Amino acid sequence: MQHYKPADFYLIGSDESGKGDSFGGICVSAVLIEKKQLINLENLQVTDSKKLSDHTVKLLAKSIQTTVMDHHTITLDPKQYNDLTKSLKNTNLLLTNLHCQLYQKLLEKNQLLRQTVTISIDQFANQELFVNYLNKLTNFTDKTVLLPDQFLINGETKSLVIAAASILARDSFINQLQLLNQKVNYDLPKGSSHGIEQALLFLNQQRGFSQIEQFKQVAKLNFKNVTKFLQQLVY
């Protein structure tokens, strides 16, 4: 059950998609609603995007975008993801940066007082770690307003506004993966286990991928299965 501050009128929820996928980059979404709009998300039967088919995600994403007060998504393609994780040296630091960028954008664009908003995040790091990551970032002036009020484990199942954000993020990631599939003329597998090595081998043998820079355009280089495969190649 999600608990709200007595003075809040607005809710922001955020989630990411692609974090556990070897192929593709990452997409982070945040949704802003007036608290009274929760019933609208209930009526749409918004739920955890991982329980939905790609087709249903696409349909729900369109409905959510026209229902909520505001929303925003940051999409990193594989190259951007790889460059940023290499420079930041920590995926969770990158995620903290992206989520906070979304909070800042929604708060400023809609001219909201922070005390009127409850921010909830699908927890990828507990509050203490999140604060540590936030303190390492230099691109925010007032960091206190960007700290979520609620860190919810499996937040998509506990908060409708996080679930809505998870659907928008998943929709963006699906679209990104479809574009990558078209680019290499191959259906790249989702997740990080089944079919990953076969897909990497196909790209190497059938699509002429022989350099790290080529794989960097489609896969996450910091994933162990990708790293292991690339170490076997002779450059």
From Swiss-Prot:
Disulfide bonds: none
GO biological process: DNA replication, removal of RNA primer; mismatch repair
Cofactor entry: a divalent metal cation
Keywords attached to this entry: Cytoplasm, Endonuclease, Hydrolase, Metal-binding, Nuclease
Traits of the deletion mutant: Probably essential, it was not disrupted in a global transposon mutagenesis study.
Positions of transmembrane segments: none
Domain of life, per lineage: Bacteria
UniProt name for this protein: Ribonuclease HIII
InterPro entries: RNase_HII/HIII, RNase_HII/HIII_dom, RNaseH-like_sf, RNaseH_sf
Subcellular location: Cytoplasm
Ribonucleoprotein found in the keyword field: no
Protein family (similarity comment): Belongs to the RNase HII family. RnhC subfamily.
Binding site for a divalent metal cation: D15, E16, D122
Residue intervals of the RNase H type-2 domain: 9-235
